[in-house]
């Protein structure tokens, strides 16, 4: 029975471990990095198996502390080695060039893993902060939408009230306009009235003038003498007393009350002689034309 070497056993373990890790969803770069790390470990064990005798090939050869520190310093300066530098560094540390190459490969793999973990932590923190800000902004947006809906409802209510007030004011203005359209002055009333007795109203207004008295007499003599006396007294009293003003309201009331009277009363009575005194000849028995010319 052929005994399996340590390199064959490690190759089998590494292949199964990579097969188990592949379904986890690592990226292609990370997967290739892990494969390089496994290859470096295989190379180290092969080297140890070839240079150790009597069962010591199964043990992994470890580097000294000073060798590890020297390799770390060189790695910080440059993580990849050229063939000439690799040979020189191996001679300085007392190692094989293959050992130095394997150590640098493993160190690069660990460094990449740490960088990925660091980047993941930074991205995770940024994601958490953005999620927190998003939640706060969404809450603020909801509160603002509620306030906007309340303000809209309030504005709509105020507009309805203003419309109602405008309607009521328009109705009041129409009522006031209707009342104003009624003729209030005497001239407007006379213009719009039909069948009005203007002569009777004129004679009645003459009676309202100051110091104008109508003397009732049975003959034309008394009418003429009273007219002369009234003219003299009115001229004297007109200088002493101011004329009485007749307002439109009293005139309108007077005209309305006089419209219902009978128009035939205009020619009846003895008062008509004062109005038609200019048309009638004087009937004085003591007056004669011969006396006037003598």
Swiss-Prot record:
One of its GO terms (molecular function) is DNA-binding transcription factor activity, RNA polymerase II-specific. Widely expressed with a lower level in siliques. Residues 56-115 bind DNA. Gene3D superfamilies: Homeodomain-like. GO terms for biological process: negative regulation of cell growth; photoperiodism, flowering; positive regulation of DNA-templated transcription; regulation of timing of transition from vegetative to reproductive phase; response to blue light. The keyword Cytoplasm does not apply. Residues 1-20, 219-238 have a biased composition (Polar residues). One of its GO terms (cellular component) is nucleus. Residues 116-151 are annotated as: Leucine-zipper. Keywords: DNA-binding, Homeobox, Nucleus, Transcription, Transcription regulation. It is found in: Nucleus. The keyword Coiled coil does not apply. InterPro entries: HD (IPR001356), HDZip_class_I_plant (IPR045224), Homeobox_CS (IPR017970), Homeodomain-like_sf (IPR009057), HTH_motif (IPR000047), Leu_zip_homeo (IPR003106). It comes from the Eukaryota. Residues 1-31, 219-241 are annotated as: Disordered. It holds the Pfam family HALZ. Probable transcription factor that may function as a negative regulator of the flowering time response to photoperiod. May act to repress cell expansion during plant development. This is Homeobox-leucine zipper protein ATHB-16. It comes from Arabidopsis thaliana (Mouse-ear cress). The gene is ATHB-16.
């Amino acid at each position: 029975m052929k005994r399996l070497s340590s390199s064959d056993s490690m190759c089998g373990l590494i292949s199964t471990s990579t097969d188990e890790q592949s379904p986890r969803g690592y990226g292609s770069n990370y997967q290739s990095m892990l494969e390089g790390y496994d290859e470096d470990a295989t190379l180290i064990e092969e080297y140890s198996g070839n240079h150790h005798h009597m069962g010591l090939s199964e043990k992994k050869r470890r580097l000294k502390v000073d060798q590890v520190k020297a390799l770390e310093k060189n790695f910080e300066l440059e993580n990849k080695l050229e063939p000439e530098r690799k040979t020189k560094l191996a001679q300085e540390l007392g190692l094989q060039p293959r050992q130095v190459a394997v150590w640098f490969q493993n160190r690069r793999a660990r460094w990449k893993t740490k960088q990925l973990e660091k980047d993941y932590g930074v991205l995770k923190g940024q994601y958490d902060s953005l999620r927190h800000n998003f939640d706060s902004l969404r809450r603020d947006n909801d509160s603002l939408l509620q306030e906007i809906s309340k303000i809209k409802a309030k504005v709509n209510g105020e507009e309805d009230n203003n419309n109602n007030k405008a309607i009521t004011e328009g109705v009041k203005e129409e009522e006031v306009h209707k009342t104003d359209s009624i003729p209030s002055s005497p001239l407007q009333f006379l213009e719009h009235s039909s069948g009005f007795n203007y002569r009777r109203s004129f004679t009645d207004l003459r009676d309202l003038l100051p110091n104008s008295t109508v003397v009732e007499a049975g003959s034309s003599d008394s009418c003429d003498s009273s007219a002369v006396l009234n003219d003299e007294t009115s001229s004297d009293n007109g200088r002493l007393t101011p004329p009485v003003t007749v307002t439109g309201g009293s005139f309108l009331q007077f005209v309305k009350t006089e419209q219902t009277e009978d128009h035939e009363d205009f020619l009846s009575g003895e008062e008509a002689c004062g109005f038609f005194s200019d048309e009638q000849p004087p009937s004085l028995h003591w007056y004669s034309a011969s006396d006037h010319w003598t």
